[in-house]
Amino acid sequence: MPKQLKEIKEFLLTARRKDAKSVKIKKNPDNVTKFKVRCSKYLYTIVVTEKEKAEKLKQSLPPGLQVKELK
């Protein structure tokens, strides 16, 4: 079962962990963006409803992380 995070700061800390492997970004037509970070034990997700916040979060992801965008 994936773990849903509420805070963007908490998500960024999770994405910077050593066991974080990749991030998937899923965009829905009604301005809902889901970020999913795969760690060794859990898949952590966060739902962002604002387009500007989603773009900011995408830019602040760690550079060494593999990012995959889904439709």
From Swiss-Prot:
Family the entry assigns: Belongs to the eukaryotic ribosomal protein eL38 family.
GO CC terms, sorted: cytosolic large ribosomal subunit
Gene Ontology molecular function: structural constituent of ribosome
InterPro entries with a match to the protein in the record: Ribosomal_eL38, Ribosomal_eL38_sf
GO biological process: one example: translation
PANTHER family: 60S RIBOSOMAL PROTEIN L38 (PTHR10965), LARGE RIBOSOMAL SUBUNIT PROTEIN EL38 (PTHR10965:SF0)
Gene3D superfamilies: 3.30.720.90
This protein's UniProt keywords: Ribonucleoprotein, Ribosomal protein
Protein source organism: Ixodes scapularis
Stated name of the protein: Large ribosomal subunit protein eL38
Entry superkingdom: Eukaryota
